[in-house]
């Protein structure tokens, strides 16, 4: 990454999402998916993080098979994918969970012990 690159962050309000929210509570149709994607970088530009929350995990071989067998309930294939980038190595983790691990509300998405929370000031 060049030191000339300037990273800009925005809050949901600045992005125009405050009125409509992030859609955490919206249902996902059978065989469908919904995801939320966030990138971040360190001030020095050498380290990064990507966070992807899924309802209907597009990377899941289990969801792929279930969809092709006519049993593709998106809520039964939820996951949180975290990737850490660095100058020497990158690491990632993803755990797929079933529908009992999913809790949804307009302000919050829980996947097992992990959660995303939407505030006017940002995402936590």
What feature does the model see in each segment?
Residues 1-124:
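Targeting-peptide/extracellular-domain and disordered-appendage signature
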């Amino acid at each position: 990454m060049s030191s000339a690159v300037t990273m800009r962050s925005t809050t949901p309000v600045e992005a125009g999402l405050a009125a409509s929210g992030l859609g955490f509570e919206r249902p996902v149709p059978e065989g469908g998916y919904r995801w939320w994607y966030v990138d971040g970088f360190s001030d020095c530009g050498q380290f990064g993080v990507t966070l992807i929350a899924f309802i209907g995990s597009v990377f899941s071989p289990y969801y792929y098979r279930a969809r092709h067998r006519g049993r593709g309930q998106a809520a039964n294939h939820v996951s949180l994918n975290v990737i850490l980038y660095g100058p020497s190595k990158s690491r990632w983790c993803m755990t797929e969970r079933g529908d009992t691990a999913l809790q949804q509300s307009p302000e919050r998405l829980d996947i097992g012990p992990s959660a995303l929370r939407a505030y006017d000031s940002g995402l936590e």
